[in-house]
């Protein structure tokens, strides 16, 4: 039996106070869904199986280019991060895996595995870092990494990615995510074609080191840290990379890495259709790559993304098995609370998408009834699925209200007393 950090008594007490209302709400929603030909228990069962990974760096306090304001009880190392992730998993029952970032989370792999298994956690995709310089690094990535003009720097970046794979093999991970900051700030600074060719050559060396049962995820981003051009700037370039590398290379979609107002759900559909959707980094944004909490700004867009995912799931799309992870920066909130709510919002979008009357939708589409087609989607989106999500948590041992239970447990105050306070502000995302 896995250990838990929040006491069972606290969880049970909070659940007991909320259970009668939840049961009434669940029964009421069940009756309404039954009139639509939907079995609420079947939807709940699917929600219970849905999972999203927590990024190790997400449990720390985030920042911006201008400042970072330390939070109380920040994790001191990866082992503190694992404990924070265990709290999220315990209360939401939706986040059973942690995604590590190397070298930020570098430690003895066997010790890491033991620490995670203590709380019933596993490890999701490994994340390499060639967008900043490590303390003991020989060559700098200031002017690029996998696309750098210097062969030695490219080789160093390749070796780092291969090291991430080796660490991941011990941990039981099955994927490597590669995001680079390579690009330029001025016209003429780099030759677009040569830089991309160097990147492809380097990534082929990384792909060659991939175990047979692993996947390689490449992540595109329109801008930042480079502001004139980025080597892997959009889904078109990302798709070319995945096609060039091989069958185990896929495109990873971060919801904040696109130009404003881009139709992300259509990009998702295209990548599914051509069997190159690897997975997601869920977050939300208003202006750019804001890394805000998932569903906090545009929950309808999140629903529309999941509408495409559920459509692929139900139609049995070939090779469809996307990875799900949160990727956020928490500057003014408790990271644990934000990550719990974000995991729930991702589940919410999934549950709502499961309610879409797909037979009716297809009929309206084929009949060119634009109004009723969009109303069919809106009918699912407007349905309050909170009772389904809460009941799923209750049935699997989680908290009906994760944030209220977390606050009642006093976890943040406890770790703030144990972990030395970080003093002084700084700039930087993490």
UniProtKB/Swiss-Prot annotation:
Keywords: Isomerase, Manganese, Metal-binding. GO terms for molecular function: isomerase activity; metal ion binding. It comes from the Bacteria. Its EC number is 5.3.1.-. Its cofactor is Mn(2+). Mn(2+) binds at residues 257, 289, 291. InterPro entries: L-rhamnose_isomerase, L_rhamnose_iso, Xyl_isomerase-like_sf, Xyl_isomerase-like_TIM-brl. It holds the Pfam family AP_endonuc_2. Belongs to the rhamnose isomerase family. NCBIfam families: L_rham_iso_rhiz (TIGR02629). This is Probable sugar isomerase mlr5709.
């Amino acid at each position: 039996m896995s250990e838990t950090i929040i006491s069972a008594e606290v969880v049970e007490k909070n659940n007991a106070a909320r259970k009668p209302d939840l049961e009434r709400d669940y029964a009421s929603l069940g009756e309404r869904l039954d009139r639509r030909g939907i079995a609420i228990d079947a939807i709940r069962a699917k929600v219970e199986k849905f999972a999203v990974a927590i990024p190790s760096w997400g449990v720390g306090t985030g920042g911006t280019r201008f400042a970072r304001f330390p939070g109380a009880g920040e994790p001191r190392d990866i082992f503190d991060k694992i404990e924070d992730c265990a709290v999220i998993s315990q209360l939401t029952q939706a986040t059973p895996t942690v995604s590590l970032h190397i070298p930020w989370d570098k430690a003895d792999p066997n010790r890491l595995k033991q620490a995670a298994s203590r709380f019933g956690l596993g490890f999701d995709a490994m994340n390499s870092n060639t967008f900043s310089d490590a303390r003991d690094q020989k060559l700098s990535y200031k002017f690029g990494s996998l696309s750098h003009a210097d062969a030695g720097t490219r080789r160093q970046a390749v070796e780092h990615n291969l090291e991430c794979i080796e660490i991941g093999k011990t941990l039981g991970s099955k994927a490597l995510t590669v995001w680079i900051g390579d690009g330029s700030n001025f016209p003429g600074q780099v030759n677009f074609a040569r830089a991309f060719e160097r990147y492809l050559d380097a990534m082929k060396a990384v792909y060659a080191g991939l175990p047979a049962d692993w996947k390689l995820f490449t992540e595109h981003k329109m801008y930042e840290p480079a502001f004139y051009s980025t080597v892997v700037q959009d889904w078109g370039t990302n798709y070319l990379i995945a096609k060039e590398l091989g069958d185990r290379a896929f495109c990873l979609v971060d919801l904040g890495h696109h130009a404003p107002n881009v139709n992300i759900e259509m990009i998702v559909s295209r990548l599914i259709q051509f069997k190159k959707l690897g997975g997601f980094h869920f977050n939300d944004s208003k202006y750019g790559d804001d890394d805000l909490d998932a569903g906090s700004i545009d929950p309808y867009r999140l629903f529309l993304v999941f509408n495409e995912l559920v459509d692929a799931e139900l139609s049995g799309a070939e090779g469809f098995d996307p990875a799900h992870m949160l990727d956020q920066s928490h500057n003014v909130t408790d990271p644990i609370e934000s990550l719990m709510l974000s995991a729930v919002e991702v589940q919410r979008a999934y549950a709502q998408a499961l309610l879409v009357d797909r037979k009716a939708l297809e009929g309206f589409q084929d009949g060119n009834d634009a109004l009723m087609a969009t109303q069919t989607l809106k009918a699912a989106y407007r349905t309050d699925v909170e009772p389904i999500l809460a009941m799923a948590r209750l049935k699997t041992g989680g908290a009906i209200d994760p944030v209220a239970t977390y606050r009642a447990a006093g976890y943040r105050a406890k770790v703030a007393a144990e972990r030395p306070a970080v003093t002084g502000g700084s700039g930087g995302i993490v």
